[in-house]
A protein has these predicted regions:
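Cytochrome P450
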Residues: 1-418
Length: 418
Protein backbone atom coordinates (compact mmCIF):
# COMPACT_ATOMS: atom_id res chain seq x y z
CA UNK A 1 0.00 0.00 0.00
CA UNK A 2 1.14 3.55 -0.63
CA UNK A 3 2.26 5.92 2.12
CA UNK A 4 -0.03 8.94 2.09
CA UNK A 5 0.98 12.38 3.31
CA UNK A 6 -1.37 14.49 5.39
CA UNK A 7 -2.70 17.70 3.84
CA UNK A 8 -4.82 20.61 5.06
CA UNK A 9 -8.40 21.22 3.98
CA UNK A 10 -7.55 24.90 3.38
CA UNK A 11 -6.61 24.27 -0.26
CA UNK A 12 -10.04 22.73 -0.83
CA UNK A 13 -12.19 25.10 1.23
CA UNK A 14 -15.06 27.16 -0.16
CA UNK A 15 -12.80 30.22 -0.29
CA UNK A 16 -10.22 28.36 -2.41
CA UNK A 17 -12.78 28.09 -5.24
CA UNK A 18 -13.96 31.70 -5.28
CA UNK A 19 -11.43 32.75 -7.94
CA UNK A 20 -11.87 29.57 -9.95
CA UNK A 21 -11.26 25.86 -9.54
CA UNK A 22 -7.77 25.16 -8.10
CA UNK A 23 -6.77 23.02 -11.07
CA UNK A 24 -3.04 23.27 -10.34
CA UNK A 25 -3.68 21.68 -6.97
CA UNK A 26 -5.66 18.86 -8.57
CA UNK A 27 -3.03 18.34 -11.28
CA UNK A 28 -0.34 17.91 -8.63
CA UNK A 29 -2.56 15.64 -6.55
CA UNK A 30 -3.25 13.30 -9.47
CA UNK A 31 0.47 13.03 -10.21
CA UNK A 32 1.84 12.80 -6.70
CA UNK A 33 -0.84 11.58 -4.32
CA UNK A 34 -4.14 10.79 -6.05
CA UNK A 35 -5.75 9.44 -2.88
CA UNK A 36 -4.56 11.81 -0.18
CA UNK A 37 -5.59 12.26 3.43
CA UNK A 38 -7.01 15.68 4.28
CA UNK A 39 -7.23 16.92 7.85
CA UNK A 40 -10.31 18.88 8.92
CA UNK A 41 -10.71 21.30 11.79
CA UNK A 42 -14.40 20.44 11.99
CA UNK A 43 -14.28 16.70 11.36
CA UNK A 44 -12.25 13.49 11.41
CA UNK A 45 -10.62 14.05 8.02
CA UNK A 46 -11.26 12.47 4.65
CA UNK A 47 -9.68 10.84 1.63
CA UNK A 48 -9.51 13.18 -1.36
CA UNK A 49 -9.82 11.20 -4.61
CA UNK A 50 -8.70 13.09 -7.71
CA UNK A 51 -7.84 10.60 -10.46
CA UNK A 52 -10.51 9.81 -13.07
CA UNK A 53 -10.24 6.03 -12.77
CA UNK A 54 -10.57 6.15 -9.00
CA UNK A 55 -13.47 8.62 -9.05
CA UNK A 56 -15.39 6.37 -11.44
CA UNK A 57 -14.55 3.23 -9.47
CA UNK A 58 -15.78 4.72 -6.19
CA UNK A 59 -18.89 6.19 -7.79
CA UNK A 60 -19.95 2.85 -9.25
CA UNK A 61 -19.11 0.68 -6.24
CA UNK A 62 -22.04 1.38 -3.92
CA UNK A 63 -21.45 -1.99 -2.22
CA UNK A 64 -18.26 -0.61 -0.66
CA UNK A 65 -18.72 3.17 -0.85
CA UNK A 66 -22.07 4.35 0.43
CA UNK A 67 -24.08 7.49 -0.30
CA UNK A 68 -26.59 6.52 2.39
CA UNK A 69 -24.16 6.07 5.27
CA UNK A 70 -22.86 9.55 5.97
CA UNK A 71 -24.69 11.24 3.10
CA UNK A 72 -23.12 12.98 0.11
CA UNK A 73 -21.84 16.26 1.61
CA UNK A 74 -18.56 16.71 3.46
CA UNK A 75 -19.95 17.77 6.82
CA UNK A 76 -20.73 15.00 9.27
CA UNK A 77 -24.44 14.78 10.04
CA UNK A 78 -26.11 12.82 12.83
CA UNK A 79 -28.07 9.72 11.86
CA UNK A 80 -31.51 11.17 12.64
CA UNK A 81 -30.77 14.34 10.69
CA UNK A 82 -29.51 12.29 7.75
CA UNK A 83 -32.74 10.31 7.67
CA UNK A 84 -34.81 13.50 7.88
CA UNK A 85 -33.11 15.08 4.86
CA UNK A 86 -32.56 11.92 2.81
CA UNK A 87 -33.01 12.42 -0.92
CA UNK A 88 -32.48 10.23 -3.95
CA UNK A 89 -28.77 11.09 -4.01
CA UNK A 90 -28.38 10.11 -0.33
CA UNK A 91 -29.51 6.50 -0.72
CA UNK A 92 -28.06 3.21 -1.91
CA UNK A 93 -29.80 0.37 -3.72
CA UNK A 94 -32.29 -1.16 -3.15
CA UNK A 95 -33.94 1.96 -1.64
CA UNK A 96 -32.31 4.17 -4.27
CA UNK A 97 -33.64 1.95 -7.05
CA UNK A 98 -37.17 2.10 -5.66
CA UNK A 99 -37.06 5.87 -5.22
CA UNK A 100 -35.65 6.41 -8.68
CA UNK A 101 -38.40 4.26 -10.17
CA UNK A 102 -41.01 6.77 -8.95
CA UNK A 103 -39.82 9.36 -11.48
CA UNK A 104 -37.60 7.61 -14.01
CA UNK A 105 -40.29 7.00 -16.70
CA UNK A 106 -40.75 10.76 -17.09
CA UNK A 107 -37.04 11.31 -17.69
CA UNK A 108 -36.22 8.78 -20.39
CA UNK A 109 -34.67 10.36 -23.51
CA UNK A 110 -37.74 9.53 -25.58
CA UNK A 111 -40.24 11.00 -23.13
CA UNK A 112 -38.11 14.09 -22.57
CA UNK A 113 -37.93 14.72 -26.31
CA UNK A 114 -41.65 14.16 -26.80
CA UNK A 115 -42.75 16.35 -23.89
CA UNK A 116 -40.21 19.15 -23.87
CA UNK A 117 -38.69 19.97 -27.27
CA UNK A 118 -41.45 22.32 -28.38
CA UNK A 119 -41.76 24.03 -25.00
CA UNK A 120 -38.01 24.58 -24.60
CA UNK A 121 -37.60 25.84 -28.17
CA UNK A 122 -40.33 28.44 -27.68
CA UNK A 123 -38.96 29.43 -24.27
CA UNK A 124 -35.41 29.84 -25.58
CA UNK A 125 -36.56 32.00 -28.48
CA UNK A 126 -38.58 34.25 -26.17
CA UNK A 127 -35.79 34.52 -23.59
CA UNK A 128 -33.13 35.32 -26.18
CA UNK A 129 -35.41 37.85 -27.88
CA UNK A 130 -35.70 39.73 -24.60
CA UNK A 131 -31.99 39.52 -23.76
CA UNK A 132 -30.87 40.37 -27.30
CA UNK A 133 -32.88 43.60 -27.34
CA UNK A 134 -29.67 45.26 -26.15
CA UNK A 135 -26.00 44.58 -26.92
CA UNK A 136 -24.90 44.16 -23.32
CA UNK A 137 -26.55 42.22 -20.49
CA UNK A 138 -25.90 39.72 -17.69
CA UNK A 139 -26.00 36.26 -19.27
CA UNK A 140 -26.70 34.61 -15.91
CA UNK A 141 -29.57 36.83 -14.80
CA UNK A 142 -31.17 37.24 -18.22
CA UNK A 143 -30.69 33.80 -19.81
CA UNK A 144 -28.93 31.07 -17.82
CA UNK A 145 -31.05 31.53 -14.70
CA UNK A 146 -34.30 32.10 -16.58
CA UNK A 147 -34.61 29.07 -18.83
CA UNK A 148 -33.97 26.25 -16.31
CA UNK A 149 -36.20 27.89 -13.69
CA UNK A 150 -39.15 28.16 -16.06
CA UNK A 151 -38.63 24.57 -17.23
CA UNK A 152 -38.48 23.44 -13.60
CA UNK A 153 -41.62 25.39 -12.75
CA UNK A 154 -43.50 23.73 -15.59
CA UNK A 155 -42.07 20.34 -14.67
CA UNK A 156 -43.23 20.63 -11.06
CA UNK A 157 -46.41 22.56 -11.69
CA UNK A 158 -45.23 25.53 -9.63
CA UNK A 159 -47.27 28.71 -10.20
CA UNK A 160 -45.47 31.38 -12.20
CA UNK A 161 -45.61 33.88 -9.35
CA UNK A 162 -43.76 31.50 -7.00
CA UNK A 163 -40.81 30.64 -9.22
CA UNK A 164 -38.55 33.57 -8.32
CA UNK A 165 -38.98 32.67 -4.64
CA UNK A 166 -38.01 29.06 -5.30
CA UNK A 167 -35.01 30.17 -7.34
CA UNK A 168 -33.78 32.30 -4.45
CA UNK A 169 -34.17 29.40 -2.03
CA UNK A 170 -32.35 27.05 -4.39
CA UNK A 171 -29.53 29.57 -4.75
CA UNK A 172 -29.20 29.82 -0.99
CA UNK A 173 -29.46 26.11 -0.32
CA UNK A 174 -26.36 25.18 -2.32
CA UNK A 175 -24.38 28.42 -2.03
CA UNK A 176 -21.89 27.12 0.50
CA UNK A 177 -20.17 30.06 2.16
CA UNK A 178 -21.16 32.66 -0.40
CA UNK A 179 -22.30 35.85 1.36
CA UNK A 180 -24.46 37.03 -1.55
CA UNK A 181 -26.54 33.89 -1.97
CA UNK A 182 -26.38 32.40 1.55
CA UNK A 183 -26.25 35.30 4.03
CA UNK A 184 -27.88 33.21 6.76
CA UNK A 185 -25.08 30.62 6.81
CA UNK A 186 -22.04 32.13 5.07
CA UNK A 187 -18.95 31.79 7.25
CA UNK A 188 -21.13 30.61 10.14
CA UNK A 189 -20.43 26.98 11.11
CA UNK A 190 -22.83 27.36 14.04
CA UNK A 191 -25.75 28.13 11.73
CA UNK A 192 -24.82 25.22 9.49
CA UNK A 193 -24.89 22.83 12.46
CA UNK A 194 -28.21 24.24 13.67
CA UNK A 195 -29.72 23.46 10.28
CA UNK A 196 -28.12 20.05 9.75
CA UNK A 197 -31.51 18.35 9.61
CA UNK A 198 -32.49 20.31 6.49
CA UNK A 199 -31.26 19.73 2.91
CA UNK A 200 -27.67 20.91 2.47
CA UNK A 201 -27.72 22.08 6.13
CA UNK A 202 -29.41 25.26 5.01
CA UNK A 203 -32.39 27.15 6.42
CA UNK A 204 -33.44 27.49 2.78
CA UNK A 205 -33.96 23.73 2.81
CA UNK A 206 -36.46 24.19 5.64
CA UNK A 207 -38.22 26.91 3.66
CA UNK A 208 -38.42 24.69 0.58
CA UNK A 209 -40.00 21.96 2.72
CA UNK A 210 -42.60 24.46 3.92
CA UNK A 211 -43.31 25.52 0.36
CA UNK A 212 -43.69 21.89 -0.77
CA UNK A 213 -46.15 21.25 2.08
CA UNK A 214 -48.21 24.30 1.11
CA UNK A 215 -48.16 23.31 -2.57
CA UNK A 216 -49.32 19.81 -1.67
CA UNK A 217 -52.24 21.23 0.31
CA UNK A 218 -53.22 23.46 -2.60
CA UNK A 219 -52.93 20.64 -5.12
CA UNK A 220 -54.76 17.98 -3.11
CA UNK A 221 -57.66 16.88 -5.31
CA UNK A 222 -56.43 19.01 -8.20
CA UNK A 223 -53.69 16.90 -9.71
CA UNK A 224 -52.26 17.20 -13.20
CA UNK A 225 -49.58 15.70 -15.43
CA UNK A 226 -46.71 17.48 -13.67
CA UNK A 227 -44.02 15.76 -11.62
CA UNK A 228 -45.33 17.10 -8.30
CA UNK A 229 -48.64 15.36 -8.98
CA UNK A 230 -46.66 12.23 -9.79
CA UNK A 231 -44.88 12.50 -6.43
CA UNK A 232 -48.21 12.89 -4.64
CA UNK A 233 -49.58 9.71 -6.22
CA UNK A 234 -46.34 7.79 -6.78
CA UNK A 235 -45.72 4.25 -5.58
CA UNK A 236 -42.67 3.64 -3.39
CA UNK A 237 -42.41 -0.04 -2.51
CA UNK A 238 -46.19 -0.42 -2.54
CA UNK A 239 -47.08 2.75 -0.64
CA UNK A 240 -47.37 6.49 -1.16
CA UNK A 241 -44.50 8.80 -0.32
CA UNK A 242 -44.51 10.23 3.19
CA UNK A 243 -44.68 14.00 3.63
CA UNK A 244 -40.96 14.16 4.32
CA UNK A 245 -40.08 11.97 1.33
CA UNK A 246 -42.13 14.23 -0.93
CA UNK A 247 -40.48 17.32 0.57
CA UNK A 248 -37.02 15.89 -0.02
CA UNK A 249 -37.79 14.87 -3.60
CA UNK A 250 -39.03 18.41 -4.20
CA UNK A 251 -35.94 20.04 -2.67
CA UNK A 252 -33.63 17.87 -4.76
CA UNK A 253 -35.49 18.71 -7.96
CA UNK A 254 -35.29 22.43 -7.20
CA UNK A 255 -31.49 22.08 -7.18
CA UNK A 256 -30.92 19.35 -9.77
CA UNK A 257 -33.45 20.71 -12.25
CA UNK A 258 -32.36 24.31 -12.05
CA UNK A 259 -29.04 25.18 -10.48
CA UNK A 260 -26.79 22.71 -12.30
CA UNK A 261 -28.22 23.48 -15.75
CA UNK A 262 -27.77 27.19 -15.09
CA UNK A 263 -24.13 26.55 -14.21
CA UNK A 264 -23.52 24.63 -17.43
CA UNK A 265 -25.18 27.37 -19.49
CA UNK A 266 -23.05 29.99 -17.76
CA UNK A 267 -19.72 28.22 -18.12
CA UNK A 268 -20.55 27.23 -21.68
CA UNK A 269 -21.11 30.85 -22.70
CA UNK A 270 -17.91 31.87 -20.91
CA UNK A 271 -15.98 29.12 -22.71
CA UNK A 272 -17.24 30.25 -26.11
CA UNK A 273 -16.33 33.86 -25.28
CA UNK A 274 -12.82 32.81 -24.30
CA UNK A 275 -12.47 30.48 -27.30
CA UNK A 276 -13.97 32.37 -30.26
CA UNK A 277 -12.48 29.88 -32.70
CA UNK A 278 -14.71 27.18 -31.19
CA UNK A 279 -17.78 29.38 -31.42
CA UNK A 280 -16.95 30.01 -35.07
CA UNK A 281 -16.63 26.25 -35.65
CA UNK A 282 -20.09 25.70 -34.18
CA UNK A 283 -21.56 28.45 -36.34
CA UNK A 284 -20.00 27.00 -39.47
CA UNK A 285 -20.78 23.36 -38.69
CA UNK A 286 -24.05 22.80 -36.76
CA UNK A 287 -23.39 19.05 -36.80
CA UNK A 288 -20.93 19.70 -33.95
CA UNK A 289 -23.76 20.70 -31.60
CA UNK A 290 -23.98 17.44 -29.66
CA UNK A 291 -20.23 17.10 -29.10
CA UNK A 292 -20.10 20.80 -28.23
CA UNK A 293 -22.65 20.29 -25.48
CA UNK A 294 -20.70 17.33 -24.09
CA UNK A 295 -17.57 19.49 -24.03
CA UNK A 296 -19.48 22.26 -22.26
CA UNK A 297 -20.53 19.73 -19.63
CA UNK A 298 -16.96 18.49 -19.15
CA UNK A 299 -15.68 22.05 -19.03
CA UNK A 300 -18.33 23.24 -16.58
CA UNK A 301 -18.57 20.23 -14.24
CA UNK A 302 -21.40 21.86 -12.25
CA UNK A 303 -20.85 19.66 -9.18
CA UNK A 304 -17.25 19.77 -7.94
CA UNK A 305 -17.49 16.80 -5.60
CA UNK A 306 -19.65 14.39 -3.68
CA UNK A 307 -18.97 12.27 -0.64
CA UNK A 308 -19.05 8.55 -0.02
CA UNK A 309 -18.39 6.57 3.17
CA UNK A 310 -16.48 3.29 3.14
CA UNK A 311 -18.58 0.39 4.37
CA UNK A 312 -15.71 -2.11 4.58
CA UNK A 313 -11.93 -2.13 4.73
CA UNK A 314 -10.88 -1.78 1.10
CA UNK A 315 -8.52 0.06 -1.23
CA UNK A 316 -8.69 2.91 -3.70
CA UNK A 317 -5.85 2.41 -6.12
CA UNK A 318 -2.99 1.38 -3.84
CA UNK A 319 -4.25 3.22 -0.77
CA UNK A 320 -5.82 1.35 2.13
CA UNK A 321 -9.21 2.66 3.22
CA UNK A 322 -10.82 1.67 6.52
CA UNK A 323 -14.50 1.04 7.10
CA UNK A 324 -16.11 4.28 8.20
CA UNK A 325 -13.62 6.52 6.39
CA UNK A 326 -15.02 9.53 4.59
CA UNK A 327 -14.16 9.73 0.87
CA UNK A 328 -14.53 12.85 -1.29
CA UNK A 329 -14.60 12.21 -5.04
CA UNK A 330 -13.61 15.22 -7.15
CA UNK A 331 -15.45 15.34 -10.47
CA UNK A 332 -13.74 18.69 -11.13
CA UNK A 333 -10.37 16.94 -11.10
CA UNK A 334 -11.49 13.82 -12.97
CA UNK A 335 -12.73 15.92 -15.90
CA UNK A 336 -9.24 17.39 -16.33
CA UNK A 337 -7.36 14.09 -16.02
CA UNK A 338 -4.71 14.10 -18.74
CA UNK A 339 -4.61 10.28 -18.84
CA UNK A 340 -8.22 10.28 -20.09
CA UNK A 341 -8.63 13.57 -21.97
CA UNK A 342 -6.05 14.72 -24.51
CA UNK A 343 -5.16 18.37 -23.87
CA UNK A 344 -7.68 18.57 -21.00
CA UNK A 345 -7.32 22.35 -20.68
CA UNK A 346 -8.26 22.88 -24.32
CA UNK A 347 -11.94 23.60 -24.98
CA UNK A 348 -12.56 21.43 -28.05
CA UNK A 349 -16.14 21.12 -29.28
CA UNK A 350 -15.27 18.15 -31.48
CA UNK A 351 -13.74 16.14 -28.62
CA UNK A 352 -14.55 12.49 -29.10
CA UNK A 353 -14.70 10.32 -27.13
CA UNK A 354 -15.61 12.49 -24.17
CA UNK A 355 -16.38 10.26 -21.18
CA UNK A 356 -16.86 13.15 -18.75
CA UNK A 357 -18.31 12.67 -15.29
CA UNK A 358 -20.42 15.83 -15.19
CA UNK A 359 -23.49 13.66 -14.58
CA UNK A 360 -21.63 11.29 -12.27
CA UNK A 361 -19.33 8.44 -13.16
CA UNK A 362 -21.97 5.90 -14.09
CA UNK A 363 -23.58 3.36 -11.82
CA UNK A 364 -26.89 3.85 -10.01
CA UNK A 365 -26.35 7.55 -9.33
CA UNK A 366 -26.15 8.76 -12.93
CA UNK A 367 -28.09 12.04 -13.04
CA UNK A 368 -31.80 11.31 -13.49
CA UNK A 369 -32.45 14.52 -15.44
CA UNK A 370 -29.46 14.38 -17.77
CA UNK A 371 -31.60 14.11 -20.93
CA UNK A 372 -33.58 17.24 -20.05
CA UNK A 373 -30.41 19.16 -19.17
CA UNK A 374 -28.79 18.17 -22.46
CA UNK A 375 -31.90 19.24 -24.36
CA UNK A 376 -31.86 22.71 -22.78
CA UNK A 377 -28.15 23.14 -23.51
CA UNK A 378 -28.50 21.94 -27.10
CA UNK A 379 -31.32 24.33 -27.92
CA UNK A 380 -29.69 27.35 -26.24
CA UNK A 381 -26.32 26.90 -27.94
CA UNK A 382 -27.90 26.01 -31.28
CA UNK A 383 -29.86 29.27 -31.24
CA UNK A 384 -26.87 31.22 -29.97
CA UNK A 385 -24.79 30.02 -32.92
CA UNK A 386 -27.56 31.01 -35.35
CA UNK A 387 -28.20 34.46 -33.93
CA UNK A 388 -24.86 35.75 -32.60
CA UNK A 389 -21.65 36.68 -34.41
CA UNK A 390 -19.29 37.47 -31.53
CA UNK A 391 -19.28 37.16 -27.73
CA UNK A 392 -17.20 39.35 -25.44
CA UNK A 393 -17.00 39.44 -21.66
CA UNK A 394 -17.96 42.97 -20.64
CA UNK A 395 -16.89 43.22 -17.01
CA UNK A 396 -15.91 41.11 -14.04
CA UNK A 397 -17.08 37.52 -13.80
CA UNK A 398 -18.32 36.87 -10.25
CA UNK A 399 -18.06 33.26 -9.12
CA UNK A 400 -19.80 31.44 -6.31
CA UNK A 401 -17.79 30.87 -3.15
CA UNK A 402 -18.36 27.13 -2.96
CA UNK A 403 -16.33 23.95 -3.21
CA UNK A 404 -19.50 21.95 -3.89
CA UNK A 405 -21.02 23.69 -6.91
CA UNK A 406 -19.38 25.51 -9.82
CA UNK A 407 -21.58 28.55 -9.98
CA UNK A 408 -21.25 31.92 -11.70
CA UNK A 409 -23.25 34.73 -10.09
CA UNK A 410 -22.72 37.41 -12.74
CA UNK A 411 -21.47 37.15 -16.32
CA UNK A 412 -21.70 40.50 -18.13
CA UNK A 413 -21.48 40.04 -21.89
CA UNK A 414 -21.58 42.14 -25.04
CA UNK A 415 -22.75 40.46 -28.23
CA UNK A 416 -22.88 41.32 -31.88
CA UNK A 417 -25.80 39.79 -33.69
CA UNK A 418 -26.08 38.00 -37.00
Amino acid sequence: MSQTQVHSHDALSDHAFEDGVPYEYFDAARREDPVRWIEEEDGPGYWSVTRYADVVAVTRNFQQFSSETGGTTREDIGHEDLLARQTLIDTDPPLHTAMRRVLSPRFTPGNVHKEWVGFVEELVQKTLDQAFSRPGFDWVADVAAVIPMIVLGELLGVPTEDRAYLKALGDEMIAGADPDHAPRTADSPENVKENSGYPFSSPAGRDIWKYADALRDRRDGNLGHDVFSLLMTGNLNGRKLTTRELDNFFSLLVVAGNETTRMALSHGLLAFAQNPDQFRRLKEDPSLLNTAVEEVLRWATPIHHFRRTALVDTTIGETAIKAGDKVIIWYASANRDETVFDAPYTFDISRKPNPHVAFGGGGPHICLGNSLARLELQIVFRELAKRVETIEIDGQVHRLRSNLTHGIKELPVRLTYA
